[in-house]
Regions:
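Short, well-structured secondary-structure segments
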Residues: 35-39, 71
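N-terminal pre-domain/capping segments
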Residues: 8, 12-27, 56
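Histidine-centered catalytic micro-motifs
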Residues: 5-15, 39-42, 131-132
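Non-catalytic positions within long, well-ordered alpha-helices that form the structural scaffold/packing
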Residues: 30-33, 123-124
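Catalytic phosphate/metal-binding cores of nucleic-acid and nucleotide-processing enzymes, i.e., regions
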Residues: 2
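Extended substrate/RNA-proximal surfaces in nucleic-acid metabolism proteins
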Residues: 43, 48-133
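Short secondary-structure boundary/capping segments within folded domains
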Residues: 28-29, 62
Length: 133
């Protein structure tokens, strides 16, 4: 059986569809036996996303919370099929972990070809660590 040691795709109350504080999430992660937790709130392209300044300020968070490594990141929105994201690379480069995802609020659905070209463009961005959904 594979043991999960971290969850790096989580949202705090900053992403308004989520309901937990950072402390609540860390407590749950400890109960699950995790060694790390990632905070990856939605970028500003989502209706409930954080403003860009939220991600700028993440360096002010501790690197550890309650014995867990705190991975500071973002789930950015893919804005077009050329790989444009809703946060600038100057902000992304300050983060530990960046997920890039398609969300219907940030981009209209299109063909499989268009979406594939978008994914291929996104993976060329050195500040993106993970493809989301």
């Amino acid at each position: 059986m594979i043991k999960t040691i971290a969850d790096l795709h989580t949202h705090t109350m900053v992403s308004q569809h989520a309901y937990s504080t950072l402390d609540e999430m860390a407590s749950a992660a400890r109960e699950l036996g995790f060694s790390a937790i990632g905070i990856t709130d939605h970028g500003p392209g989502m209706l409930d996303g954080a403003i860009a300044h939220h991600f700028f300020c993440m360096n002010g968070l501790p690197s550890e919370i309650g014995g867990l490594r705190l991975v500071k990141g973002a789930e950015v929105n893919i804005k077009d099929f050329h790989g444009r994201l809703d946060l600038e690379n100057s902000l992304l480069s300050r983060l530990d972990f960046v997920i890039a995802s398609y969300h219907i609020e940030a981009i209209d659905p299109a063909s499989v070809k268009d979406h594939t070209e978008g994914w291929l463009a996104v993976i060329e961005n050195p500040d993106v660590d993970c493809l989301g959904h």
